[in-house]
Amino acid sequence: MVTFSPKDLEQISEKGITQSKIERQLDEFKTGFPYLKLEAAASVGKGIKSIAAGDISKYIDLWNQYKMGDKKILKFVPASGAASRMFKNLFAFLSAEYDAPETDFEKAFFSNIEKFAFYNVLDKVCKEKENCSIHELMEKGCYKTVVDYLLNDKGLGYGQLPKGLLLFHKYVGTQRTPLEEHLVEGALYANCNGVVHLHYTVSPEHKNLFEDCVNHVKGEYESKFNVRYCVSFSVQKPSTDTIAVNPDNTPFRNSDGSLLFRPGGHGALIENLNDVDADIVFIKNIDNVVLDKFKEDTVTYKQLLAGVLVSLQTKAFEYLRLLESGQFDDDTLKEIVRFLEQELCCHKPGINDLEGAELVAYLKKKLNRPMRVCGVVKNVGEPGGGPFLAYNSDGTVSLQILESSQIDKDNSDYTKMFTEGTHFNPVDLVCATKDYNGDKFNLPDFVDRSTGFISSKSKNGKELKALELPGLWNGAMSDWNTVFVEVPLSTFNP
């Protein structure tokens, strides 16, 4: 067992982390995390619902009726992703020994530079700083000067900005950032009685920039869509950081002797999600946005997912109230079991052996959980979590979104399931986080702690091991009722 100095304990306490949590993390480094036991990859008819075209309007009507009630609907947008990875090829060009574009990527970038949404503002910067337009600089062979003004702080600083604040989309006479596209989307499907609630999770160093951007553009979109925006921001809590260790599993220390903590990954956001108060929450990543001309599908299928969620939640609440009242017979219990198995895809081997109070307790426990409906698209080789039927610690089988790291690569059946999976999850979720009495669930209670992930990293040339928390839409929502609905690829545009 590791002995922490008073200074260590002070550092741990300042982060809001308990010593017992640190000790548990150190144990997890030693033991590792178990792979999940799988039953099958989900497919249409086996865990994935394919809604007939004629039924889509029924669910959209349900959603529109729901919005007319006294409800709070919120768009929750993980937006801390840095843009630096998007520009790795341009950073490589800046440090290359040659000055003119040579690779296919570099040639394509410069020959199409006018098509980028940031072109006009970059051109303006080049004229102000160099007295030359982008094209004049290129004609002089100053390609790196153009890239320098794009990526670094002397110009637009895109290499240091988050993706949400880059000009992504070009329209006639204007351009939009992903942050703005989410404002537009919110008005189109998450507008409840003229109010649109959005919550962006951002990194601390960029919070002011996001706030400035919203304050700058909000009025324009409020006028355009005749809505009022309520926009809030949060950052990952320091208490969700995880301790880093050396290869021998002893705590890694910085050069000043202090412990090294690292962000716990997107799974840390379950705490942020737990802090927002809403009846229905749409979750979609910041960079998954489409131009207006393609938004019709996005809006239609977001409303479809929400309608499916409202339909299933209404039925689950009805059954929970019945179970609570005691006014049911055996046929009703069989009906509830069918709903749990056929609609929520939650199976318990040997359920027929449960009787009376034991069966009622089981049904209550499984129905009285947060619920999410996830859009899944046909697999075209994009990276993303896969929809699976997986075993839970209580022996039940339910739907989960799994990443490749959660699957045992030495199990040929499992790797075949993963590689031959028909669908993937593009992080397109609609969530219900309140119970049938209208009280909020405490979301950390529904996390499967055994689904974390250990990765190898380095700092200052020294190897270390890092611990990632169960992913937000993976293990952090493991104990939710999960439903998959097929949506078209046109709704996914990272």
Where are these regions (language model features)?
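Long, compositionally biased intrinsically disordered regions
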Residues: V2-V44, Y362-L367, R372-V373, V380, ...
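Domain-scale recognition of functional cores that engage charged ligands
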Residues: E10-S13, T31-P34, L38-V380, G384-G385, ...
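Short conserved micro-motifs at the rims of enzyme active sites and ligand-binding pockets
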Residues: K88-N89, A244, K293-K295, D413, ...
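Conserved catalytic alpha/beta cores of large enzymes that bind or transform nucleotide phosphates
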Residues: C132-K140, D287, K302-E341, F418-P494
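Residues that cap or initiate secondary-structure elements
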Residues: H206, G381, D408, D435-N437, ...
